Amino acid sequence: MKLKPVLYLLMLLGCLGLKSAHAATLAHGISASWHSFSQTWNEPQTFDPYIPSIIWHNRWTYDADKIDKYNERPWGAGGGVSHFDKKGNWNGIYLMAFKDSFNKWELISGYGWEKTWRPLRDPDFHLGLGYTAGVTMRDNWSYIPIPVLLPLASIGYEYVSFQMTYIPGTYNNGNVYFAWLRWQL
């Protein structure tokens, strides 16, 4: 019977230790991300034009009449700066303006990070997988800045990358693939 309070105390201390370790890991992750953002801003290695290329509404999650009304050609442009860290991973800060699904102007600005792989013998071919965090502003939201945290992927050769993201959603809302070309100058 005296063992029960001791076990409860050990479990409580263990939980507090896990929360403390989790908080320390989260704090380290935020600190590392801020350092990468700061380094990209202050020490850019390339200046990059962006060309929005495609908006695709997932056909499994939309009614056909909705898809027929949507724009899937995102005319627009953007720019950014890039920095590759010691491990060869891509960091970027960007701003893009393009025609959204309703053919209205949308702005998006943020920071992106991709783990970069060079799986072939040719070191110029590369793949990337990571995330982007930023804000977007759209006509149907009265251009109020809305925070975004989205997956990011790319395939590239030398200084040109085809980057993409997927905006999750519900039926007839969200579930959009968005892609653009990025040149490193």
From Swiss-Prot:
Subunit structure and binding partners: Homodimer.
PROSITE patterns (UniProt xref): PROKAR_LIPOPROTEIN (PS51257)
Cellular compartments annotated: Cell outer membrane
Entry EC number(s): 2.3.1.251
GO cellular component: cell outer membrane
Residues where lipid is bound covalently (S-diacylglycerol cysteine): C15
Active-site residues per Swiss-Prot or TrEMBL entry: H57, D100, S101
One Pfam family hit: PagP
Signal peptide positions on this chain: 1-14
Described function: Transfers a fatty acid residue from the sn-1 position of a phospholipid to the N-linked hydroxyfatty acid chain on the proximal unit of lipid A or its precursors.
Entries under NCBIfam families matching the protein: PRK11045.1
GO molecular function: acyltransferase activity
Catalytic activity: a lipid A + a 1,2-diacyl-sn-glycero-3-phosphocholine = a hepta-acyl lipid A + a 2-acyl-sn-glycero-3-phosphocholine; a lipid IVA + a 1,2-diacyl-sn-glycero-3-phosphocholine = a lipid IVB + a 2-acyl-sn-glycero-3-phosphocholine; a lipid IIA + a 1,2-diacyl-sn-glycero-3-phosphocholine = a lipid IIB + a 2-acyl-sn-glycero-3-phosphocholine
Lipidation (N-palmitoyl cysteine): C15
UniProt entry keywords in alphabetical sequence: Acyltransferase, Cell outer membrane, Lipoprotein, Membrane, Palmitate, Signal, Transferase
Family under the similarity heading: Belongs to the lipid A palmitoyltransferase family.
Annotated site location: Role in lipopolysaccharide recognition: K66
Bilayer disposition of the protein: Lipid-anchor
Descriptive protein name: Lipid A acyltransferase PagP
Swiss-Prot/TrEMBL GO biological process terms: lipid A biosynthetic process
Positions bearing the site annotation: Role in the phospholipid gating: Y171
UniProt keyword Transferase, yes or no: yes
